[in-house]
């Protein structure tokens, strides 16, 4: 079971995570298209994702996740960002989140060691469960983002004169 406290900590730290992710997206050699996205827009999208992570991670196949990431895909298509860069943006988000959890001791803080033989196994199980759910969430997000991108691409192609 994922600790609600751990998700809460991620959401609380969304501001600093947002800055790190937005900086990486706008400077990473694999995502040059994101340099054309206004910094405020990029930061707002990343912040909303991290801030709502707790709601979304429990049900990654929800309509809200589909709506958010489909819109993100459509918008990025409209901005002319290649799909490969958008896919890599999701990878960057996931990497930053996992690194932040690890580097800032959020797991230890959320699962304090008390006493008894069962603390460590529960600690490891919770970490593994969180890691699995983060992966599942980003897999679904990537799917919906790609669907939104493709839908916008199809609309764009259909509206062009032949």
Predicted segments with their positions:
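N-terminal low-complexity or simple alpha-helical regulatory segments
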Residues: 2-84
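Long, amphipathic alpha-helical coupling/dimerization segments that relay conformational signals between
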Residues: 65-162
């Amino acid at each position: 079971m994922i600790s609600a406290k751990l998700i809460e900590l991620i959401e609380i730290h969304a501001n600093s995570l947002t800055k790190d992710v937005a900086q990486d997206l706008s400077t990473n050699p694999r995502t040059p298209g994101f340099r054309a996205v206004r910094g405020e827009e990029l930061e707002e999208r990343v912040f909303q994702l991290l801030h709502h992570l707790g709601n979304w991670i429990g049900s990654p196949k929800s309509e809200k996740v589909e709506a958010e990431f489909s819109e993100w895909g459509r918008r990025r298509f409209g901005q002319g960002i290649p799909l490969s860069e958008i896919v890599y943006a999701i990878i960057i988000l996931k990497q930053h989140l996992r690194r932040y959890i690890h580097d800032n001791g959020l797991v230890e803080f959320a699962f304090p060691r008390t006493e008894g033989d069962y603390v460590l196994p529960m600690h490891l199980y919770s970490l593994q469960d969180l890691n699995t759910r983060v992966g599942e969430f980003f897999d679904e997000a990537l799917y919906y983002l790609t669907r939104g991108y493709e839908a916008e691409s199809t609309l764009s192609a259909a509206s062009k004169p032949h």
